[in-house]
Amino acid sequence: MKFMLAVLGDPLHSQGPITAYRFAEAAVTAGHTIHRVFFYQGAVLVANDLAEPPQDEISITELWQHLASENSIELMACIASASRRGIFDEDEAVRYEKPTSSISSGFIIGGLGQLMEGILVADRTVTFGS
């Protein structure tokens, strides 16, 4: 089965991103595929390359990066939500005249069109967070 995941919760105040990660990990272990993970609203903070968790905490960003690279999963941050929170890829950094990009490696910027495309391509869409 092919899944599309929509993650909405801020990783600092919501279980959405870690619950979505655990679901994705279990799904690929069971032989399913994850077409795309779309981070929306506060969940785009998972893609922030400038954030650094304390050394005694798990980095949700690194967990997603590893899972995505091992399983060819596309990690996409909503462009509107990301720019509101200071997260830019190279193109958006130039567009908004920012000194550098701030998106973590393995993540890309996309819009609601890509969310809809992912929903149409997947067999099931699962939403995490509120």
Task: Locate predicted features.
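Hydrophobic/aromatic residues located in beta-strands of well-ordered beta-sheets
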Residues: F3, I34-V37, L75
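A generic local structural motif
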Residues: A24-E25, T61-L63, G110-Q114
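A glycine-rich helix N-cap at a beta->alpha junction
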Residues: P53-A82
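Short, conserved active-site loops that position catalytic residues or coordinate cofactors/metal ions
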Residues: F38-N48, S81
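Histidine-anchored nucleotide/phosphate-binding helix
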Residues: P17-A30, V37
